[in-house]
A protein has these predicted regions:
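Glycine-rich FAD pyrophosphate-binding loop
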Residues: 33-53
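Conserved Rossmann-like nucleotide-cofactor binding loop
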Residues: 24, 47, 163
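C-terminal helical "tail/cap" subdomain of flavin- and related membrane-associated enzymes
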Residues: 315-413
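Predominantly flavin-linked oxidoreductase catalytic cores and closely associated redox partners
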Residues: 118-258
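N-terminal Rossmann-like FAD-binding beta1-loop-alpha1 element of flavoenzymes
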Residues: 14-40
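A short, basic/flexible loop-to-alpha-helix module at the beginning of a structural domain
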Residues: 2-13, 290
């Protein structure tokens, strides 16, 4: 049979194909190209392009960027978090866990484009198009199509975000009986766009005055602010919240204090969290970052995990078969912490829990003790190098939760 010229597909053969050019995918392409692999980076949209995100870069994320040699030329810097709600305010500076005790924030349309440019400078090629039609032999990915290109790669790293449409075609399953997030985000002008603290409001109410299991945020960006909110949900206890409408209501509550202008670029998203997906690897392919639900269940933060899993995945290249090795690696790095965070987040989905626990946590000596630690957990800043009481409690509690909930979905093969 003769195939018409308009339907002919070109073939591309590479060592490593990376599907998705967000922070995780671009970082993977940087690592792979610098390691000497012929690397193809694929994204469905031309750059720059926007993504629903809080835009915050914690000291943990900045540490990963330092390891990559990527300099974020953001003039804005912040010192940590301020948490508000239930009649109290707690200030939580970034701890001295990483070399820098400063964070920053950069809109995703700038940050992603920066990382893609670094990947191209490292030698990765960029292809714009949608990855579809994977051809599998057993659990080995032989080839897939990107528009009229057929891509054959020795290794494939899938970093196509929270929806992970290509990951789904490979068998990725999202377990919505575990905690997931729903969120909305916008930008607004503010005379306080240089404020040196990121602000979170943990007493998030809907227009009817009902406390929701989530929080609102205002993250200064130096030229404007990122304002958003997120709520926690499960299949059995869904958050009955229209996030975009709730965001406008939240903005009205904060407008006077922050001098907020009109909201622009309002977007929303749903977030699988805490490793609550299965089917994250095959013989020669791995899901990383948001696609692998590497998202903190307490706040929806995922950039630092995306950067870390990118480096980890490239380290695994050359392994004979990563079907089990990759989820095992994710378990080892994040398993106990994610199980504990998912358990804590699940508590917040019970309507009666937050109104009772919130005032205790945010006021008085208990709040001064607990909430800086909670802020650190929300900033993904617990590591094995920590030696203080909170870090030890985190690891001990993580071990206990792990023992109690071993059957819970956590990157199951």
């Amino acid at each position: 049979m003769i195939v018409p010229m308009s339907e002919q597909i070109d073939s591309t053969l590479v060592d490593v194909a990376v599907v998705g050019a967000g922070p995780a995918g671009a970082a993977a392409a940087i690592h792979a190209a610098r390691a000497g692999y012929d690397t193809l980076l694929i994204d469905s949209s031309p750059f720059p392009r926007d993504k629903t995100c809080g835009d915050g870069l914690t000291p943990r994320a900045l540490h990963q960027l330092d390891l990559l040699g990527v300099e974020v030329n953001a003039t804005y810097r912040n010192r940590g978090l301020k948490l508000h709600g239930f009649g109290g305010t707690v200030t939580a500076p970034w701890p001295a866990t990483y070399p820098s005790r400063e964070g920053t924030a950069l809109p995703r349309y700038e940050f992603d484009a920066l990382l893609v440019a670094v990947a191209r400078d490292a030698g990765a090629r960029l292809l714009t198009g949608t990855a579809t039609t994977p051809v599998l032999e057993g659990n080995r990915l032989v080839s897939f199509d990107v528009d009229k290109q057929r891509v054959t790669a020795q290794w494939v790293i899938v970093a196509d975000g929270v929806r992970s449409t290509f990951g789904k075609q490979l068998g990725r399953t999202w377990h919505r009986d575990e905690v997931y997030g729903i969120a909305a985000r916008a930008y607004a002008a503010s005379p306080h766009d240089g404020e040196e603290w990121m602000h979170s409001h943990v007493e998030l109410k809907d227009p009817d005055g009902v406390v929701q299991p989530g929080y609102g945020w205002i993250f200064p960006l130096g030229q404007h602010v990122n304002i958003g909110l997120g709520a926690l949900s499960t299949a059995t206890r869904p958050a009955h919240l229209n996030t975009k409408k709730a965001l406008h209501f939240y903005a009205e509550q904060q407008r006077s204090e922050w001098g907020l202008g009109e909201l622009r670029n309002v977007t929303s998203a749903m977030l699988p969290m805490g490793g609550a997906v299965s089917g994250v690897a095959g013989a020669n392919w791995m899901l990383i970052g948001d696609a692998a639900a590497c998202v903190n269940p307490l706040n929806g933060e995922g950039i630092d995990y995306g950067l870390e899993t990118a480096a980890m995945a490239v380290e695994m290249l050359g392994t004979k078969d990563v079907t089990l090795a990759w989820p095992d690696r994710l378990h080892a790095e994040y398993g106990e912490a994610f199980l504990l965070a998912r358990t804590a987040a699940r508590l917040l989905t019970y309507p009666q829990f937050l109104p009772l626990a919130g005032p205790v946590a945010m006021r008085g000596p208990v709040g001064r003790m607990l909430m800086p630690a909670a802020a650190r957990l929300m900033g993904n800043l617990i590591t094995d190098e920590d030696r203080d009481l909170v870090a030890r409690a985190w690891r001990l509690a993580g071990g206990a939760v792990s023992a109690l909930r071993r059957d819970t979905p956590l990157w199951d093969a």
